């Protein structure tokens, strides 16, 4: 369980701070067994709308260097178009894939991406296009060159240089981030929001990262499922699979 909050801890009370939105990403796609599904259980959301434009926060842009300096302006304008009331922004990579020309779809179906956590890692090749084994619907799995900025090594398309990879994936990201594929979810207490990491990108909004008023409080719990989704019940996780892919103290009662 991952806690998403801006509630202050027990340390020194600091002045209110603003944080820009993050990179568009999927959760933990850089591991050999990625997260398939994520969900938010919402406890508390901001109710303040004190900014002059009637939103919780102003339009806070990332600092220089957040994205690659050669990223085109059209792409960056779509990246920075984020909600300002504490919503989570989503983009539908399944519909975006379906709208591509058939020849482009065939090209992408053959595309392999090398993902890795650190630049020094050899990494592993994974398909850029994911096919849902139950519905057969295809989607783009994390079509982003550098989804964690400097924190995680950029991906590389098999057979492409770094520059070719960035330009190719920037074009796909710009396609996916069109408004017709976007959905911004305004959380309410008690909401359970579930999404597929294979079929969406998402982005955390600009937030007040240090708060001075309870009206600005934001508290959600993120729960995630790892590995290929099971479409048959009961799911039978073997001890070997759990030992290789899940950190203690997880246990399966199946």
Predicted segments — roles?
Residues 1-191, 198-254:
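Non-heme Fe(II) oxygenase catalytic core, chiefly the N-lobe of the double-stranded beta-helix
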């Amino acid at each position: 369980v991952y806690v998403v909050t801006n509630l202050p801890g027990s340390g020194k009370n600091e002045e209110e701070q603003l944080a820009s939105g993050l990179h568009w990403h999927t959760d933990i796609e850089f591991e050999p067994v990625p997260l398939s599904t994520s969900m938010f259980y919402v406890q508390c959301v901001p109710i303040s709308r004190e900014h002059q434009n009637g939103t919780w926060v102003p339009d806070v842009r990332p600092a220089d260097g957040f994205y690659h300096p050669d990223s085109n302006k059209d792409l960056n304008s779509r990246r920075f178009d984020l909600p300002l009331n504490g919503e989570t922004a989503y983009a539908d990579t399944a519909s975006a894939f379906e709208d591509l020309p058939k020849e482009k779809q065939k090209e992408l179906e053959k595309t392999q991406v090398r993902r890795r956590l650190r630049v020094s890692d050899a990494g592993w090749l994974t398909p850029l296009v994911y096919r849902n084994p139950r519905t057969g619907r295809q989607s783009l799995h994390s079509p982003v060159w550098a989804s964690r900025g400097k924190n995680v090594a950029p991906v590389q398309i098999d057979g492409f240089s770094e520059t070719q990879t960035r330009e190719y994936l920037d074009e796909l990201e710009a396609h996916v981030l069109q408004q017709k594929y976007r959905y911004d979810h305004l959380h309410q207490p008690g909401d359970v929001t579930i999404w597929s990491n294979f079929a969406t990108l998402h982005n955390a909004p600009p937030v007040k990262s240090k708060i001075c008023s309870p009206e600005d409080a934001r508290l959600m719990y993120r729960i995630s499922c790892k590995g290929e989704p099971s479409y048959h019940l009961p799911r039978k996780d073997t001890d070997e699979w759990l030992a290789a892919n899940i950190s203690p103290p997880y246990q399966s009662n199946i």
